[in-house]
Protein backbone atom coordinates (compact mmCIF):
# COMPACT_ATOMS: atom_id res chain seq x y z
CA UNK A 1 0.00 0.00 0.00
CA UNK A 2 1.42 3.35 -1.06
CA UNK A 3 2.18 5.89 1.62
CA UNK A 4 -0.12 8.93 1.63
CA UNK A 5 1.30 12.05 0.01
CA UNK A 6 2.56 14.79 2.29
CA UNK A 7 1.73 18.33 1.20
CA UNK A 8 4.90 20.26 0.29
CA UNK A 9 7.11 17.62 1.89
CA UNK A 10 10.28 18.77 0.11
CA UNK A 11 9.85 22.47 0.87
CA UNK A 12 8.17 22.42 4.27
CA UNK A 13 11.33 23.18 6.22
CA UNK A 14 12.45 26.18 4.18
CA UNK A 15 8.90 27.60 4.11
CA UNK A 16 8.71 27.51 7.90
CA UNK A 17 12.19 29.01 8.19
CA UNK A 18 11.49 31.89 5.79
CA UNK A 19 8.11 32.58 7.35
CA UNK A 20 9.62 32.80 10.83
CA UNK A 21 12.26 35.21 9.50
CA UNK A 22 9.54 37.46 8.07
CA UNK A 23 7.59 37.29 11.33
CA UNK A 24 10.72 38.15 13.30
CA UNK A 25 11.21 41.29 11.22
CA UNK A 26 7.55 42.39 11.56
CA UNK A 27 6.31 40.99 14.89
CA UNK A 28 3.35 43.37 15.32
CA UNK A 29 2.09 42.65 11.82
CA UNK A 30 2.46 38.88 12.08
CA UNK A 31 0.92 38.44 15.54
CA UNK A 32 -2.69 38.53 14.23
CA UNK A 33 -1.65 36.46 11.20
CA UNK A 34 -0.34 33.72 13.49
CA UNK A 35 -3.62 33.72 15.41
CA UNK A 36 -5.61 33.21 12.20
CA UNK A 37 -3.25 30.50 10.97
CA UNK A 38 -4.03 28.47 14.08
CA UNK A 39 -7.63 28.19 12.88
CA UNK A 40 -6.60 26.80 9.47
CA UNK A 41 -5.87 23.21 8.53
CA UNK A 42 -2.21 22.22 8.52
CA UNK A 43 -2.04 22.29 4.71
CA UNK A 44 -3.77 25.66 4.33
CA UNK A 45 -1.61 27.18 7.07
CA UNK A 46 1.54 25.98 5.30
CA UNK A 47 0.31 27.38 1.98
CA UNK A 48 -0.38 30.73 3.65
CA UNK A 49 3.07 30.71 5.21
CA UNK A 50 4.61 30.22 1.78
CA UNK A 51 2.77 33.25 0.44
CA UNK A 52 3.79 35.40 3.41
CA UNK A 53 7.38 34.14 3.29
CA UNK A 54 7.98 35.32 -0.27
CA UNK A 55 5.53 38.15 -0.92
CA UNK A 56 6.71 41.79 -1.05
CA UNK A 57 6.43 43.80 2.15
CA UNK A 58 3.88 45.99 0.38
CA UNK A 59 1.55 42.99 0.09
CA UNK A 60 1.93 42.23 3.79
CA UNK A 61 1.02 45.80 4.68
CA UNK A 62 -1.66 46.51 2.08
CA UNK A 63 -3.88 43.42 2.10
CA UNK A 64 -5.68 41.53 4.87
CA UNK A 65 -5.05 37.87 5.67
CA UNK A 66 -8.38 36.86 4.14
CA UNK A 67 -7.19 37.83 0.65
CA UNK A 68 -4.28 35.39 0.80
CA UNK A 69 -6.43 32.73 2.45
CA UNK A 70 -8.45 32.48 -0.77
CA UNK A 71 -5.31 31.65 -2.75
CA UNK A 72 -4.08 29.16 -0.15
CA UNK A 73 -7.39 27.33 0.23
CA UNK A 74 -7.86 27.04 -3.51
CA UNK A 75 -4.32 25.79 -4.03
CA UNK A 76 -4.68 23.12 -1.34
CA UNK A 77 -8.05 22.02 -2.75
CA UNK A 78 -6.52 21.60 -6.20
CA UNK A 79 -3.59 19.62 -4.77
CA UNK A 80 -5.92 17.29 -2.87
CA UNK A 81 -8.52 16.75 -5.60
CA UNK A 82 -6.58 16.91 -8.88
CA UNK A 83 -3.91 14.22 -9.38
CA UNK A 84 -2.29 16.28 -12.15
CA UNK A 85 -1.69 19.10 -9.67
CA UNK A 86 -0.44 16.74 -6.96
CA UNK A 87 2.05 15.26 -9.44
CA UNK A 88 3.61 18.63 -10.26
CA UNK A 89 7.16 19.32 -9.06
CA UNK A 90 6.76 21.26 -5.83
CA UNK A 91 8.61 24.34 -7.09
CA UNK A 92 6.30 24.52 -10.14
CA UNK A 93 3.22 24.19 -7.93
CA UNK A 94 4.43 26.80 -5.45
CA UNK A 95 5.48 29.46 -7.94
CA UNK A 96 3.00 28.96 -10.75
CA UNK A 97 -0.19 27.52 -9.20
CA UNK A 98 -0.30 28.58 -5.55
CA UNK A 99 1.40 31.98 -5.60
CA UNK A 100 -0.92 34.98 -5.57
CA UNK A 101 1.12 37.56 -7.46
CA UNK A 102 1.84 37.66 -11.20
CA UNK A 103 3.53 41.03 -11.66
CA UNK A 104 2.78 44.43 -10.09
CA UNK A 105 -1.01 44.19 -10.16
CA UNK A 106 -3.46 44.96 -7.38
CA UNK A 107 -4.28 41.83 -5.37
CA UNK A 108 -7.84 40.70 -4.65
CA UNK A 109 -9.59 37.42 -3.98
CA UNK A 110 -10.35 35.63 -7.25
CA UNK A 111 -9.09 32.06 -7.38
CA UNK A 112 -12.03 30.26 -5.79
CA UNK A 113 -14.50 32.29 -7.84
CA UNK A 114 -12.67 31.65 -11.11
CA UNK A 115 -12.45 27.92 -10.36
CA UNK A 116 -16.20 27.68 -9.80
CA UNK A 117 -16.82 29.56 -13.06
CA UNK A 118 -14.39 27.54 -15.18
CA UNK A 119 -14.24 24.13 -13.50
CA UNK A 120 -17.06 22.41 -15.38
CA UNK A 121 -15.63 23.47 -18.76
CA UNK A 122 -12.33 21.66 -18.26
CA UNK A 123 -13.58 18.51 -16.52
CA UNK A 124 -11.41 15.55 -17.54
CA UNK A 125 -8.94 17.62 -19.57
CA UNK A 126 -5.17 17.52 -19.34
CA UNK A 127 -3.19 20.74 -18.79
CA UNK A 128 -2.71 21.37 -22.51
CA UNK A 129 -6.42 21.03 -23.28
CA UNK A 130 -7.43 22.95 -20.18
CA UNK A 131 -5.12 25.87 -21.02
CA UNK A 132 -6.73 26.29 -24.44
CA UNK A 133 -10.25 26.11 -23.00
CA UNK A 134 -9.47 28.56 -20.19
CA UNK A 135 -8.15 31.02 -22.75
CA UNK A 136 -11.44 30.78 -24.67
CA UNK A 137 -13.25 31.59 -21.41
CA UNK A 138 -10.94 34.54 -20.81
CA UNK A 139 -11.65 35.86 -24.31
CA UNK A 140 -15.38 35.69 -23.57
CA UNK A 141 -14.89 37.77 -20.42
CA UNK A 142 -12.28 40.40 -21.37
CA UNK A 143 -10.99 42.16 -24.45
CA UNK A 144 -8.10 44.51 -25.16
CA UNK A 145 -8.32 48.17 -24.20
CA UNK A 146 -5.33 50.49 -23.84
CA UNK A 147 -4.99 52.18 -20.43
CA UNK A 148 -2.25 53.96 -18.51
CA UNK A 149 -3.56 53.33 -15.00
CA UNK A 150 -1.97 51.01 -12.46
CA UNK A 151 -2.44 47.35 -13.37
CA UNK A 152 -5.83 46.13 -12.17
CA UNK A 153 -6.38 42.95 -10.21
CA UNK A 154 -7.55 39.88 -12.12
CA UNK A 155 -11.07 40.12 -10.69
CA UNK A 156 -11.28 43.80 -11.66
CA UNK A 157 -10.34 42.99 -15.27
CA UNK A 158 -13.06 40.33 -15.22
CA UNK A 159 -15.66 42.78 -13.87
CA UNK A 160 -14.67 45.60 -16.22
CA UNK A 161 -14.45 43.34 -19.24
CA UNK A 162 -11.29 44.81 -20.72
CA UNK A 163 -7.66 45.65 -20.07
CA UNK A 164 -4.31 46.23 -21.72
CA UNK A 165 -2.05 43.27 -22.50
CA UNK A 166 -0.46 43.30 -19.03
CA UNK A 167 -3.89 43.17 -17.41
CA UNK A 168 -5.21 40.53 -19.79
CA UNK A 169 -2.20 38.35 -18.99
CA UNK A 170 -2.63 38.86 -15.23
CA UNK A 171 -6.27 37.85 -15.64
CA UNK A 172 -5.44 34.80 -17.75
CA UNK A 173 -2.62 33.62 -15.47
CA UNK A 174 -4.96 33.79 -12.46
CA UNK A 175 -7.69 31.95 -14.35
CA UNK A 176 -5.25 29.20 -15.31
CA UNK A 177 -3.79 28.91 -11.81
CA UNK A 178 -7.29 28.80 -10.35
CA UNK A 179 -7.86 25.41 -12.00
CA UNK A 180 -4.35 24.08 -11.42
CA UNK A 181 -2.64 24.85 -14.73
CA UNK A 182 0.86 26.21 -13.98
CA UNK A 183 1.10 29.63 -15.62
CA UNK A 184 3.17 32.81 -15.64
CA UNK A 185 3.39 36.12 -17.44
CA UNK A 186 6.26 36.78 -19.85
CA UNK A 187 7.21 40.22 -21.06
CA UNK A 188 9.04 41.75 -24.00
CA UNK A 189 10.08 45.19 -22.66
CA UNK A 190 10.89 46.50 -26.14
CA UNK A 191 10.05 45.33 -29.64
CA UNK A 192 12.77 45.64 -32.29
CA UNK A 193 10.31 46.78 -34.98
CA UNK A 194 8.44 49.53 -33.09
CA UNK A 195 8.44 51.63 -29.93
CA UNK A 196 6.22 49.33 -27.89
CA UNK A 197 6.20 46.30 -25.60
CA UNK A 198 3.99 43.28 -24.94
CA UNK A 199 3.06 40.75 -22.26
CA UNK A 200 1.59 37.30 -22.77
CA UNK A 201 1.27 33.96 -20.97
CA UNK A 202 3.23 30.74 -20.69
CA UNK A 203 1.82 27.48 -19.35
CA UNK A 204 3.74 24.46 -18.10
CA UNK A 205 2.78 20.96 -19.21
CA UNK A 206 4.60 17.74 -20.07
CA UNK A 207 7.75 19.15 -18.51
CA UNK A 208 8.00 22.18 -20.82
CA UNK A 209 6.78 25.76 -21.16
CA UNK A 210 4.41 26.74 -23.98
CA UNK A 211 3.02 30.16 -24.85
CA UNK A 212 -0.36 31.63 -25.72
CA UNK A 213 -1.81 35.09 -26.21
CA UNK A 214 -3.85 36.18 -23.18
CA UNK A 215 -7.55 36.44 -24.09
CA UNK A 216 -6.49 35.67 -27.68
CA UNK A 217 -7.40 31.98 -28.08
CA UNK A 218 -5.94 29.73 -30.74
CA UNK A 219 -6.60 26.05 -31.36
CA UNK A 220 -3.01 25.14 -30.50
CA UNK A 221 -0.32 26.34 -28.12
CA UNK A 222 2.79 28.23 -29.24
CA UNK A 223 0.82 30.41 -31.63
CA UNK A 224 0.01 34.11 -31.41
CA UNK A 225 0.07 37.32 -33.41
CA UNK A 226 3.37 38.16 -31.71
CA UNK A 227 5.20 34.98 -32.80
CA UNK A 228 7.23 36.68 -35.53
CA UNK A 229 7.82 39.83 -33.48
CA UNK A 230 9.10 37.81 -30.52
CA UNK A 231 11.60 36.02 -32.77
CA UNK A 232 13.34 39.39 -33.23
CA UNK A 233 13.01 40.63 -29.65
CA UNK A 234 16.12 41.65 -27.73
CA UNK A 235 14.81 40.33 -24.41
CA UNK A 236 11.86 38.32 -23.12
CA UNK A 237 11.72 37.63 -19.40
CA UNK A 238 9.56 36.16 -16.66
CA UNK A 239 9.49 36.97 -12.95
CA UNK A 240 9.69 34.76 -9.87
CA UNK A 241 9.27 35.85 -6.23
CA UNK A 242 10.71 32.77 -4.52
CA UNK A 243 14.39 32.71 -3.56
CA UNK A 244 14.65 29.10 -4.75
CA UNK A 245 14.49 29.41 -8.53
CA UNK A 246 12.58 26.50 -10.14
CA UNK A 247 14.61 26.59 -13.37
CA UNK A 248 15.89 29.04 -15.93
CA UNK A 249 18.65 31.59 -16.52
CA UNK A 250 18.77 34.39 -13.96
CA UNK A 251 19.46 37.76 -15.61
CA UNK A 252 18.89 40.12 -12.69
CA UNK A 253 16.85 41.10 -9.68
CA UNK A 254 14.46 43.93 -8.88
CA UNK A 255 13.96 44.10 -5.12
CA UNK A 256 12.83 40.62 -4.12
CA UNK A 257 11.88 39.68 -7.69
CA UNK A 258 14.21 37.58 -9.84
CA UNK A 259 14.14 38.00 -13.62
CA UNK A 260 14.56 34.92 -15.82
CA UNK A 261 15.63 35.00 -19.46
CA UNK A 262 13.04 33.28 -21.69
CA UNK A 263 14.30 34.52 -25.07
CA UNK A 264 15.60 31.15 -26.29
CA UNK A 265 12.02 29.87 -26.48
CA UNK A 266 11.20 32.49 -29.09
CA UNK A 267 14.36 33.45 -30.95
CA UNK A 268 17.66 32.01 -32.08
CA UNK A 269 20.14 32.80 -29.32
CA UNK A 270 23.85 32.34 -28.74
CA UNK A 271 25.66 31.62 -25.49
Feature map (PLM): residue ranges:
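Active-site neighborhood of thiol-dependent amide/isopeptide-bond enzymes
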Residues: 121-206
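Secondary-structure boundary elements
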Residues: 2-160, 245-248, 255
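His-Asp-centered catalytic microenvironments across diverse enzyme cores
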Residues: 145-146, 178, 186-195, 199, ...
Amino acid sequence: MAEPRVFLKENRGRIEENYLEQAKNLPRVFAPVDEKLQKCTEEVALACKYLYAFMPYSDIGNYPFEVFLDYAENGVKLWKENPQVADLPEEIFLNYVLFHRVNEEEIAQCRTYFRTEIGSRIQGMNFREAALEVNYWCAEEATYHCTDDRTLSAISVYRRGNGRCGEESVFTVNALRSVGVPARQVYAPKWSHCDDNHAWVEIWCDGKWYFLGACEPEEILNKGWFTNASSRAMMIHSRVFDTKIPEGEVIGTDGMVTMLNELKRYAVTKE
